[in-house]
Amino acid sequence: WDGGTVTKEPTETETGTKTFTCTRCSETKTETIPAGSCPSAGFTDVPGEGNWAHAGIDYCVANGLMSGVGDNLFAPKMTTTRAQIVQILYNLEGEPKVSGTMPFTDLTQNWYKDAVLWAYQTGVVSGTSATTFAPDLPVTREQIAVILMGYAEKVLGVTRTWTPADLSTFPDAGSVSGWAKDALADAVALGLISGASNGGQTYLEPQGSATREQVATILMEFCKNVKK
């Protein structure tokens, strides 16, 4: 059996469910998670259950995709970096063993080196040059879409069976980079990115930095709608 995936997050009053899959026959079994065992309860800065970001944070914490930043903090408003997003996907993939030559010379911390090598070798993320990865560079919302859809195609083998969204319905569609349009249209169609409301209109904010709470929510939707 695999390590299991939380398919329903528990709340203070309702039980949750964790589903395990047999690695040989694909049979599944479930386990009840007691009520009151909110995965993010140990963090002092996570918004309450009524907040839009709570479920995504719970999901990512419960499934080992994201952890805190220390001192009982999750830092939901903190910008997500390139190193962090590849580490999250590496966690999602089960931290497979990697070997080979690392082409990047700017990786200063050990915690993300295996994830960066995995992302580079699979083609999920490339460097900012032949020898630099820029691990501390913030990722934008459109970059998250490109990275996730690239992971879906190159690692999961997902093929498009959906109709891409029409980005022209968003007032800031013109600010989407040409290289990100297809991936962002797919991400919107799959419910991974829904846009941000402002003044009665919904904006994509493709150049906006992706916060940890946004990434957690996007990842939850990705796991439920794409990586099934």
Region locations from a protein language model:
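Alpha-helical membrane segments in multi-pass integral membrane proteins
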Residues: S177-L190, A216
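Phosphate/pyrophosphate-binding loop motifs in nucleotide- or prenyl diphosphate-using proteins
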Residues: G64, G123, G191
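Feature responds to low-complexity, polar/acidic, surface-exposed segments characteristic
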Residues: A35-H54, S67-D114, V125-E142, G150-K181, ...
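Extracellular modular ligand-binding repeats in secreted and cell-surface proteins
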Residues: W1-C38
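Alpha-helix C-terminal capping/helix-coil junction sites
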Residues: V61, Y120-Q121, V188
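Extracellular/lumenal glycan-associated surfaces
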Residues: T17-E27, Q87-N91, R141, V146-G150, ...
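Mature N-terminal segment immediately following signal peptide/propeptide cleavage
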Residues: D58-M66
